[in-house]
Amino acid sequence: MSSTQGALVGVGPPRFSIKRAGPPPKHRSLRGVENRWALAFVAPYAAVFVTFVVYPVAYALWLGARPSLFVELISDPLYLPTVVNTLFFVGIGVNVTMFAALLLSGFFLRPRRWIRLLLVPYLLPWAIATVQACVSFHWMLIDQRGLLDGLLSALFEIDGPLWFNHRWLAVGANIIAFIWKWMPFWTVIFIAGRMTIPRAIYDAASVDGATGVRRFVHVTFPLLANLYLICTLLTTLWALGDFTTTYLVSGGAPALSSHVLATLGFHYAFDTAKPALGVAAMMTSLPVLIPVVIVLMRRLQVREVQL
């Protein structure tokens, strides 16, 4: 072995280090400018969101989270009847609204000109402002001067009930007003959903003998089930937080017995000057509200949306 070979024994192959070159200085400066512009555009929206959403919610949770408030709330004789009213308002109002809207969406798709013309007045309660709709409904039922009681007296010579002198009549009036206001909106949504169902599916069902009720049960409703569920969950959220309907239709009458949680919280906060108790009253709806929101968000995250 020569001296040169001996020197090379134990020496591995030569190593090369490759240094990754970053973006040119010009590109780095452009990226920094883009990031600064992005922050500049996002900052106003973030500031508005923090000011008008995050801060009020956090402050309300801090204000109404004291255990003593919930003890005071449960001991108040108004609270438990209000919870019952809220359950009836949400349970009956939401389910009747959604199911009736689903049925009427099929009616308004019939190829009759007079049906299309009937759709215009049907949509009016939803098309007008919520305050106007609720005030109009209140005046239709007020005492003996209301439209409904006047029609009963003129047509059948009977005196109509005093709607706002009895608790369950007042709660029923609130529920009917909610249905009357929102059923047209969901009818339009279900009409749009029905129009996306291919006609070939109905033709195949007709060949198999599915008509009328059977076609609705086995074809239409399964195809609209996901849409129906999402709309029902969304309406439940709206109904739980609905303040305008009860406040303007019955106003809590008689003797504050027809309140729901939204209006009871307002009553505590402004009529009795106990804002913390009002927030606590609203927070008691969270055990229902949070699961509904979670289920709704999961349904909205489904990649393949089934009508």
Task: Describe the residue ranges of each PLM region.
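A structural signal for multi-pass alpha-helical bundles of membrane permease subunits
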Residues: 34-307
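Short, Lys/Arg-rich, polar N-terminal cytosolic tail immediately upstream
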Residues: 1-33
